[in-house]
Amino acid sequence: MANIGGSNAVSSAQGSQISDSPTTVDDRLDEHKETSTQSIDHSENITQSPTSLQKPPDESNATPVGFGEDGCQSDSQEYPNSWRLAAIMIGVCLAVFSMALDNTILATAIPKITDQFTSLGDVGWYGSVYPLTNCCLTLVFGKLYTFYSTKWVYLSALAVFEIGSLICGATPSSLGLIIGRAIAGLGSSGIYLGSMIILSQSVPLQKRPLFTSLVGGLYGVAGVAGPLLGGAFTDYVSWRWCFYINPLFGAVTALFILLFFDGKEPIKSPGKIKEQISQFDLIGLFFFLPGMISLLLALQWGGQQYNWQSGRIIGLFVCSICLLSIFIMVQWRQKEKATVTLRMIKNKNVWGASLFNFCITGSFLVFSYYLPVWFQSIKNVSATKSGLMNLPMLLGVILCSIISGYGVGRIGYYTPFMYAAPIVSAIGAGLLSTFQANFGPSQWIGYQALYGIGLGLGLSQPIVVIQAAIPLIDIPSAIAIVTFIQSLGGSVSVSIAQNVFRNELLRGLAQNAPKVDAHKLITAGPTTLRYVVPAELLERVLVAYNSAITHAFYVGAAFSVLAMIGALPIQWISVKGRE
């Protein structure tokens, strides 16, 4: 959700000085004034914890916010007044909501689309091509937001997204739909990233956690609204309105951003044309893009369209490893012109927030995918009703995300919430993995709510970490890295869960119902399960199906636990100034 760290990270750097408490933004301003006569490189960072404050000589930890002239954001900057901020927030929220809606609205429309285009074999592409292009260009947009005006890069990304949506809605063929989804994915990769950057330039740091949580919570709203809107459009109007709705939202966003958001100057001067081209690390991208496409295709196809041991999947993995290895070497040589600089990789706040985001988002997507499958297969409900039965988790995520954002602004620190999120979500995930066919509402409502509360505590925190702990000059690239890793986490976790589900289902069927055609059962899907299984074998098949789903839940639980590893390195930095 997007688009998330924590312990008392006490650095071991030499020549450190000890302080007695965590530092605030104003404390750092005072320190900066006192040392203004000294020559201090802006890339050095002051590491703080509840018990210590250190200034390491290396640049692995970038200086937190609070400085003005040395490249970090200063909270003394002017922000839009209340009514301008309200208009900007409406525009940003509509853009993020339509982008998130595009991930969920298509599911209930696919049967009608495949009937019209007679394109059942293309269904996999409808779902995979959008996140594929979205993930690949996120880091590129990080560079664009660094060297060009935030307003115009954002509006350009929005325009590409809306063009893709219009192509999807107007296309006369399945191929056109796939192309439109790919174009929309390209644009969406700059929308969420740009929305977070607009927030960082429009909202004071202390209030940013709440606003970030509000925007992030829209993913949960889209998770509920998407299938319902998709079903309504498909049944009462046309499936094409699943895509035509996006330009309506986009027009409002474009108008509000044009009128009310000041066009910020580029964070870095792009220089002349030749210098601009060199800053975009074209050599690195030449290896990165095909490497990521190979990896994501292998994760999408493995265990589904093709066996994991097939030559196609193995070839894709080998290709991705080779290309991404070359990309890493290129990044090492490119230094500050790299797509992912060594300074970013070494910064504990960046890699900690990225790892946390990878795990917590991965866990969320596993349960978002398999809880509706459990309701449809085990409880024998429709796709629409399964979405409603999934509300306890989604409402827990939305409400607790907003509450945690408010809490961070009040107490000043995001790290306690990042510690709590893996613990609470792991407990909830563990309870969800005990699901049985005879479980009633008290169990599936309560367990989902607990898990959703845990997720809500942490989902928005990685972006807050970046906004609070990273210099202004590096914020676009840092948010791009965290967002990119988030997308990758969802692809990896769902791929693992699908493989676990498939293997456990095959094992369970062989043990409980060997006469059932396993391949036919898997391709039938959860909603038609009872039509392809003989009545006398249904109970045994449901036992195997329930076991397969709960084993997939184990993957989500494991990702929740692993999120704590990402929380531990995060520095304790207050988002509050001195009152």
Curated annotation (Swiss-Prot):
Ranges of compositional bias, category Basic and acidic residues: 25-35
Region (Disordered): 1-75
Transmembrane regions listed in the UniProt entry: 85-105, 121-141, 159-179, 183-203, 214-234, 241-261, 282-302, 310-330, 355-375, 388-408, 411-431, 439-459, 479-501, 553-573
Subcellular location(s) per record: Peroxisome membrane
Topology versus the membrane: Multi-pass membrane protein
Gene3D superfamilies: MFS general substrate transporter like domains, Multidrug resistance protein D
PROSITE patterns per record: MFS
Position of the signal peptide: none
Compositional bias per record (Polar residues), positions renumbered to this chain: 1-24, 36-54
Disruption phenotype: Abolishes the production of 15-deoxyoxalicine B and accumulates decaturin C and 5-deoxyoxalicine A.
GO CC terms: peroxisomal membrane; plasma membrane
GO molecular function terms listed in the Swiss-Prot or TrEMBL record: transmembrane transporter activity
UniProt keywords, alphabetically: Glycoprotein, Membrane, Peroxisome, Transmembrane, Transmembrane helix, Transport
Glycosylation sites noted in the Swiss-Prot or TrEMBL record: N45, N380
UniProt xrefs under Pfam families: MFS_1 (PF07690)
Function in brief: MFS-type transporter; part of the gene cluster that mediates the biosynthesis of 15-deoxyoxalicine B. The first step of the pathway is the synthesis of nicotinyl-CoA from nicotinic acid by the nicotinic acid-CoA ligase olcI. Nicotinyl-CoA is then a substrate of polyketide synthase olcA to produce 4-hydroxy-6-(3-pyridinyl)-2H-pyran-2-one (HPPO) which is further prenylated by the polyprenyl transferase olcH to yield geranylgeranyl-HPPO. Geranylgeranyl pyrophosphate is provided by the cluster-specific geranylgeranyl pyrophosphate synthase olcC.
PANTHER family from the UniProt entry: MAJOR FACILITATOR SUPERFAMILY, MFS EFFLUX TRANSPORTER INPD-RELATED
More details: The 15-deoxyoxalicine B cluster is a rare cluster that contains its own geranylgeranyl pyrophosphate synthase (olcC), in contrast to other related clusters which rely on a FPP/GGPP synthase localized outside of the cluster.
Similarity-based family: Belongs to the major facilitator superfamily. TCR/Tet family.
Protein name: MFS-type transporter olcL
Gene: olcL
